[in-house]
Amino acid sequence: MPKEKYDPPDPRRIYTIMSAEEVANGKKSHWDELEISGRVRSLSTSLWTLTHLTVLHLSDNNLSRIPPDIAKLHNLVYLDLSSNKLRSLPAELGNVVSLRELLLNNNLLRVLPFELGRLFRLQTLGLKGNPLSQDILSLYQEPDGMRKLLNYMLDNLSVHPEQLPHRPWITLKERDQILPSVSFTVMCYNVLCDKYATRQLYGYCPSWALNWEYRKKGIMDEIISCDADIISLQEVETEQYFTLFMPALEERGYDGFFSPKSRAKIMSDQEKKHVDGCAIFFRTEKFSLVQKHTVEFNQIAMANSEGSEAMLNRVMTKDNIGVSVLLEVHKDFSGAGMKPHHSSEKQLLMVANAHMHWDPEYSDVKLIQTMMFVSELKSIIEKAACRPGSPTPDPNSIPFVLCADLNSLLDSGVVEYLTNGGVADNHKDFKELRYNECLTNFNCNGKNGTPDGRITHGFQLRSAYENNLMPYTNYTFDFKGVIDYIFYSKTHMDVLGILGPLDPQWMMDNNITGCPHPHIPSDHFSLLTQLELHPPLLPIINGVHLPSRR
């Protein structure tokens, strides 16, 4: 796990006492360190109410036990219990995951609770002067012994075989009983590629639960239980697409399309097996593949750099990709009422999937990658919708579903751009870097568009998970937030329902500080929505769109 900067407490423990004048002037006292000394034998229960404490000195006393309530001091980074008479430690001490230093020297400890393995942020563990068992001492005395001991305890900590509670299905709208329509389900899921699932990043997870051979079963169980008509996956390893995902889903009636990140093109066959990418699967009894496309963001950045150093040095160097499939909705699935108003036409559906750059410091890159992808999708849709002799096609003429790990929060420029149809060309997420000339290439009307200071995309999109229906889609120790999305054409579709979040009380009861976890195979939660596709619209008559009828 990346270590944040940690400054140990000052051993001198200097303090100041407020003067009468300071008290009279309303100065507030603040203290977050506490020392208790004087050969104390027991601790007051009121100590466990001081949840603001970050440092607690309890050394050189006569304490024979520490109560489980120690876990209530969830802000502790330093705990000194040295030189007491402790014979055991409460398992609950392992829940104080904020700890950086835990000093247990010179006690009577023979064993340690395996729960201490959860203290993945520890930088110092003092165990000298204890009659510990030989297996503990042997590990502890090895080079990097503290880390090896903690890993051993975490890996051997028993995990209750408790079944994951079902996530609730949230109905948002009843299906239209008057006008004919068709409904289908869409899943979006970042499965956490094996090479990214390291102890350095996920130190709170046992190594066996990070192992791909263990996680892949939970991931496939999640995909199969959702039983979606369309499945969009990110961080799919190339080899796993061909040996796991495609064969397993093909057996269940799916076809699929996959592309790895751009770096795979310059790698050996052996190396490219481990490059991750994006995949889309669709149920063949409901859809047929018409077109498939891969969008390489670094190639588009190079072609549209317009002399911008930021475009070349920041955007072009990232090898993220997006994929899309143009599908035909089967007539026997859509029903007679869903037939297009031109009998020769097909009912088409565009589905796109992308994974944007991860680094929070590169908000400009994420926003431009999103613009490039949407601009390419607009071109694909316009070509597919174009008929000889017809005027310039409307990008909203074909229903569109966008699934993505955008690595961007709800208040980001990326989400604003997708939801509102555009953003200002001086949006703060561009970080005042020189992109203006490049951005016009991705504008709705191209370089000839009105220079109104906005970059627009022309689609009319809405998020399936509006109104904070999901408090987080990515859940790690350091970060919990919404970064995964399903967008859809609001002129063509409605959301009938979505899969809700996991019970937060269950997460709390099971001390799940981050994912992956033995019960949760990825650091992301899947999204699942049911969409209702409306009949195509006939030409406008007297200013009104009339739906096609039988």
From Swiss-Prot:
Per the record, the gene is cnot6l-a
Taxonomic lineage is: Eukaryota, Metazoa, Chordata, Craniata, Vertebrata
* Region of interest (Nuclease domain), ranges: 153-550
Listed cofactors: Mg(2+)
Q: What positions does the entry give for Mg(2+) 2 binding?
A: 405
Disulfide partners: none
Q: Which family does it belong to?
A: Belongs to the CCR4/nocturin family.
Q: Name one GO molecular function term.
A: 3'-5'-RNA exonuclease activity
Active site positions = 405
Region Required for interaction with cnot1, cnot3 and cnot7: start-end pairs: 1-148
Q: Name one Pfam family in it.
A: Exo_endo_phos
- Source organism's superkingdom? Eukaryota
Indicate which residues the UniProt annotation says bind Mg(2+) 1.
Answer: 235
Q: Which residues bind substrate?
A: 235, 271, 355, 360, 407, 474, 479
| Subcellular localization | Cytoplasm; Nucleus
Q: Is Kinase found in the keyword set?
A: no
Q: What's the name of the protein?
A: CCR4-NOT transcription complex subunit 6-like-A
Keyword field contains 4Fe-4S: no
List GO terms (cellular component aspect): CCR4-NOT complex; cytoplasm; nucleus
InterPro entries (alphabetical):
CCR4/nocturin_mRNA_transcr (IPR050410), Deadenylase_CCR4b (IPR034967), Endo/exonu/phosph_ase_sf (IPR036691), Endo/exonuclease/phosphatase (IPR005135), Leu-rich_rpt (IPR001611), Leu-rich_rpt_typical-subtyp (IPR003591), LRR_dom_sf (IPR032675)
The record ties this protein, via PANTHER family, to: CARBON CATABOLITE REPRESSOR PROTEIN 4, CCR4-NOT TRANSCRIPTION COMPLEX SUBUNIT 6-LIKE
This entry's Enzyme Commission designation comes to: 3.1.13.4
According to its UniProt entry, what is the function of this protein? Answer: Poly(A) nuclease with 3'-5' RNase activity. Catalytic component of the CCR4-NOT complex which is one of the major cellular mRNA deadenylases and is linked to various cellular processes including bulk mRNA degradation, miRNA-mediated repression, translational repression during translational initiation and general transcription regulation. Additional complex functions may be a consequence of its influence on mRNA expression.
- Keywords on this record? Cytoplasm, Exonuclease, Hydrolase, Leucine-rich repeat, Magnesium, Metal-binding, mRNA processing, Nuclease, Nucleus, Repeat, RNA-mediated gene silencing, Transcription, Transcription regulation, Translation regulation
